[in-house]
A protein has these predicted regions:
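Acidic/His- and Gly-rich active-site-bordering loop/insert found
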Residues: 1-12, 30
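Zn-dependent metallopeptidase/amidohydrolase metal-coordination segment
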Residues: 2-3, 268-319
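Midchain, well-structured core segments that form catalytic/ion-binding scaffolds
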Residues: 6, 46-47, 51-213
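Flexible, small-residue-rich helix->loop connector segments that border functional cores
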Residues: 26-38
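Flexible, glycine/charged-enriched surface loops at secondary-structure junctions
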Residues: 38, 95-99, 150, 171-184, ...
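Short beta-alpha connecting loops at secondary-structure transitions
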Residues: 69, 208-212, 242-244, 299-310
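His/Asp/Glu-rich mid-to-C-terminal helical/loop segments that flank catalytic regions of hydrolases
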Residues: 129-131, 147, 151-176, 219, ...
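Short, low-order "capping/linker" segments at domain edges
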Residues: 247-265
Length: 340
């Protein structure tokens, strides 16, 4: 059980770390209760990927996905992952020893929702059924920089105008496609002068959906639209992939047990997909994994105003206690082994 220790710059106090504290608090609350399995509390590093540009480094180690390329990745100060590990007094050559053993039964993660759904429903806890897949890409639009005062509108090859039209198309498609979210979170126009038509634009796209098929279809459509808009405006559109993360279903058996534990804690279970990535999706490659969400007041996360309700934390602890009790009595659960 656990979550991640890191977060993003200018963030709140509960993303990730609350799951670690809840896991530790749950173990403490057992107060001598004997279980037929051990519990390890995990605090993962680099879930967000802020420092090295690669998320889930800590949990990747448990599933054997830390290779030489990743170890060679450098942060903004030129420090590699390998060097950072050594600076913490650890040996990067022994990462393979962190791999999950065959007797590990499951991974369970408490996490704030980081969105407004549970609050809108008036529910303290959510049962996560899946973690959405996501693609991240960088698009470039290349036109012709020129004088803003002397170039007629019909003779322009304005890269920023092309990018702006495409960004509007991104929003439109996401609004028309159920449960799809698409975000252009970064735009850079060059040369960036008030009296110069933009000749080059870079823009990022983050697109997410619980269905890989739906997400891929939407992405293909947005690429076609970028090409079409660019061609009509005399601009060249290109793109490169930054990240592909497939959707991950949570373990059905664990999800059912969590639902019953939520009910036992006198809460109404709400089944939902996670729009954000989590360490649970990495561990799910090897072992059954499941997540429990806590309501996020205002739906605000990755911001200093991020918060939780203390009563919701108490309900999460109660739910966790009921869950462990159920799992301890389940022969189906105790008979499981780590997936190869």
């Amino acid at each position: 059980m656990g979550s991640h220790l890191d977060t993003v710059p200018n963030a709140g106090a509960f993303d990730g770390i609350l799951g670690v504290v809840l896991a530790a608090g749950l173990v403490e609350s057992l107060d001598g209760l004997k279980l037929p399995f051990g519990i390890e509390v995990l605090g993962f590093s680099e879930e967000e990927g802020v420092r090295f540009g690669v998320p889930f480094i800590g949990s990747r180690a448990l599933v054997g996905r830390v290779d030489e390329e990743l170890l060679g990745r450098k942060d903004g100060q030129g420090v590699s992952v390998r060097k950072a590990i050594q600076d913490f007094g650890l040996n990067s050559d022994e990462i393979s020893k962190a791999a999950l053993r065959d007797d590990v039964l499951a991974y369970i993660e408490f996490h704030i929702e980081q969105g407004p759904v549970l609050e809108s429903l008036g529910q303290p806890l959510g049962v996560v059924e899946a973690i959405v897949g996501q693609n991240r890409l960088e698009f470039s639009f290349s036109g012709q920089a020129n004088h803003a005062g002397t170039t007629p509108m019909n003779l322009r090859r304005d890269a920023l105008a092309a990018a702006a039209e495409w960004i509007a198309a991104v929003e439109n498609l996401a609004q028309r496609t159920a449960d799809l979210v698409a975000t252009v979170g970064f735009v850079e126009a060059r040369p960036g002068a008030t009296n110069v038509i933009a000749g080059e634009v870079r823009a990022t796209l983050d697109i997410r959906h619980a269905s890989d098929h739906t997400r891929t279809e939407a992405l293909d459509e947005l690429i076609r639209q970028a090409e079409s808009i660019a061609a009509r405006r005399g601009v060249i559109a290109k793109w490169r992939t930054l990240l592909v993360q497939h959707a991950v279903a949570m373990d059905p058996f664990l999800t059912e047990q969590i639902e019953r534990a939520v009910q036992k804690a006198s809460c109404q279970p709400h089944h939902m997909a996670s729009g954000a990535g989590h360490d649970a999706m990495i561990l799910a490659e090897k072992i059954p994994a499941a997540m429990i969400f806590l309501r996020t007041p205002g739906g605000i996360s990755h911001d200093p105003s991020e918060s939780v309700h203390l009563d919701d934390v108490a309900k999460a602890l109660e739910c966790g206690h009921h869950l462990l009790t159920r799992l301890a009595a389940s022969q189906e659960f105790l008979g499981r082994t780590c997936r190869a």
